Every structure is written in structure tokens, then in C-alpha cells.
Amino acid sequence: MENVQILLRQHVGAPCAAIVKAGDEVKKGTKIATPTGLGANIFSSVYGVVEEVLEDRIVIRPDEEQKDEFVPIEVEDENDKLALVKEAGIVGMGGAGFPTGIKLGINLAETEMAELDAEINPELPADFKLEHSYILINAAECEPGLEHNIRQIEEQSDKVVRGVKYCMEITHADKAIFAIKKKNNKAIEILRKAIANEAEISIHLLPDIYPMGEERAVVRECLGVNLTTMQLPSAARSVVVNLETAAKIAEAIDEKKPCITKNLTVRGKINGGNQAHVFMDVPVGVSVGELIERAGGIDGVYGEIIMGGAFTGKATELDAPITKTTGGILVTIEFPDLHGANVGLLVCACGGSEERMREIAQKMNGKVVSVCRCKQAIENKPGAPLKCLRPGNCPGQVKNNMQFKKDKCEYIIIGNCSDCSNTVMASGPKMGLKVFHQTDHVMRTVGHGLYRTLRVSKQVDQLPNGK
């Protein structure tokens, strides 16, 4: 194993501060960094020696032999489940990385439902209230091509359910709902059996469209409530927990295990085929290149390597380390060459940032002459990431397409959700605009349908009797 690089910022909030120095021996589970503000503890994922402590990372030289044992976490009261979650350094494993101990520090039984915005909830009566409080488990595996969340259900459903029950206990929620895409038949059947005797836990089936895993989309699909871009799920008496995060919670409480590993999918232009290579319990800090080699190595010339998903991931390098939030490593085919043609960018809250889309346009040899935003993309404060008013449920984009045409664009690159891409296609091609989606090079690599015209119904019924 090559050197492990553990970044000091793997979560929402401020970077952690190292509490080790060069030359220190560490074990799997040794605490090596602590928060300086909002954040989560960071632990060594291997047995070894600290080589360097840099401004943004701790570099560890692993021992040749690695033991399975780890240093257990310790808290003053071993029965304090929330304290165990906090000490274990668990964050949202689905990508955002919000510290889970902070998220679960709420008493949902005493939480009042916030006033709903009538404009985005026109179908609900003004006096609508939720009778129950909820843990909503995000099992959507939102980014196309990734499969590690579904694999965890298939192989570790008991652990996941234990984690969900702990979440319910900690937050005093009286119900839990698994939000999972209807297409995952095997996982759904396994999950159904795992909760057969859990009267307060149910399953809600989602359509196979992006972004069903966005936090507010999970609330909307499961509870029928549209939250504003400023509201948290607590406004709907709920907490949304990623599936893998729930499993980490079970590990922290049952095994006193710190958060030192990550499940992820490696996929794309890989020797042996483009199928998903799922790796469970990978030590945090292992390099992208090492995981690609474990999957078979890169097959010839490629376009780029993405860390994360096709929509929200970023281009990365072989020596970059994985973190607690890394869900995917995608090796893509080469980009098409637009030969300097004029390009318009349609930036969406559900896809890449303007910076990421400009990077893609540059790699396609296109000249960006126009930039528009999806009409539902809201900037809550200057410089903050965009938020969609109704994730996955978008109106037309005719006005933006007309602007692109006015600005003499030949091509447009879009980063929109399934529904929004569909509305772009309703008018863009008729205006002579040639459309690329920012995920096209990934979708073509993994054999997934391109995001253009929506062919999947957005409505999916719940399983009979909530199960």
C-alpha cells in the first residue's frame, strides 16, 4: 500500500487541526485531528507512521502488515449514543459531509412543523400538519452509475436497519421511511424482509430520475411537502440520513468503531469492462490511482477522472486521496472536439457549478459566449451554492434557449436534472441548438442513457401497506 493522505477537511465547516506530528506511530482508529469549529474528528485508517503534517493533510506511511483490529472510540457514558456518533467522526457519507452528530442532535418529538410556503405547496391545505416525526433514509443512490449503496442493502441490511433504529431513538422520531428507486428489485425485497417485524419502518419507491436523492426531494417524495431553499428537513419534522451513514452509526454504537472507511464505486474506461466495481470499507486516504488499479487499471486513452458522481463530481488526479464523502471514481472516454464553436452554458443547481461547466467546455474545445441559469436555481446568499426551488420538478427553459440563440451559440452544454433536461429539449433543438449534457461523456462510458427527453414517469406509488 502506498502512502495514505488524510485530508484535514472532509466535511462541512472548518478544517480540522492535526494532533499528531511527523514520526508518530499510529494505529487504525488513532485520533489524528479534531475540529476547530463545525466539523468531525478524523482518525488514522491504517497502522503506520506519520510522514508529514501539512497544512491541508496528514501523510501516513502504512505498515506492510495491516491488522483488522482498530482502536475503539471512548466517551464518558457508553450508553450515550449521540456522544458515540459525534466521537466517531461520522459525517454524511452521500457527498455533502454534514457532521452527523450535529444533524441528529434534535428532538423531533418536540419539533413543530414550520409554516409551509403556499406558492410551492398549492395542493396542501393551509392548516396541513404532519402527525408523525420521521427519519428519512436516503437510499436513492442518486448519481447514475454508482452501486455501492444498493450493494450495502443487499449485503448488510441488518446493520443498516440497526443504524436507522438508533437514529429514531436518538432523535425521538416515531417513524422511518426508506426512499429507494423502484428499479432496485433485489434490494427492495431484501429490505422488505429486513423490516418485516418493524411496524414503524416503511419503504417509499422513487422513480429513476435525477435528483431523487437531493435532501429536499426526499422530503417531498416521502412526505408530500415542498421545502423552500432555506428550510431544513426539520421544518417537516424529519431528518434525512444517507444509507451508508446509517450503517456507520450502527458501527459506532455497536462496535465503538470510528469512521475510517468508505464504500465506493469505481467505473468507466477500465480494463475488463465498464461495469461497476464496488469496494466496501476502503481506508480513507487511499489514492484514486490505487483504487483504479484494484479495479483493473485504465483502458488506454481517457478523457478525465471524476471523483464523485457524473453530475456533482469534480475532475481529479491519480494521486488524489479519497475522503469520507467520496462515492465514486469515474474514468471517462475522450471528449468530443467542438473546434472552437460558440457554446452556451445552462447552469443548474442540480448539476455542476459554472466553474465545472466551463472546465468541460474547455476540454471540448468550445468557446463560452453565453451563460444562463435554470429559472429555478436560487442563490440564497452571494457565492453560496445554488439551490433548486423544486428539485427534479422543473418548468420550461424556453427563455434561456432564446437567449442562447440570440448570443449566436451553436452548442449548449447543460447540467440539468432529468425533468429540466426534458424541458430544454422541448425547444432547444427546434431553435437549431445542439445539446450536450455535462454527463454525456460519463453516460456514454458506462452505457447509461443520455439525459435528454424524459421517458420515465415521475410518479411511483408506495409499496402496499407502507412496506
Model-found features: residue ranges?
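Redox- and metal-dependent alpha/beta enzyme cores, enriched for Fe-S-associated oxidoreductases
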Residues: 342-389
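Cofactor-cradling patches in redox/metallo enzymes
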Residues: 149-152, 183, 372-463
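Histidine-anchored nucleotide/phosphate-binding helix
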Residues: 154-170, 359-361
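Generic structural motif
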Residues: 10-14, 26-29, 43-52
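Short hydrophobic beta/alpha edge segments that flank linear recognition/processing sites
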Residues: 26-40, 57-60
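Acidic, low-complexity mobile loops and tails
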Residues: 1-18
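Gly-rich Lys/Arg/Thr-decorated short loops/hinges at beta-loop-alpha junctions or inter-strand turns
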Residues: 92, 135-149, 378-384
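Hydrophobic alpha-helical positions that pack around
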Residues: 114, 118, 174-288, 294-301, ...
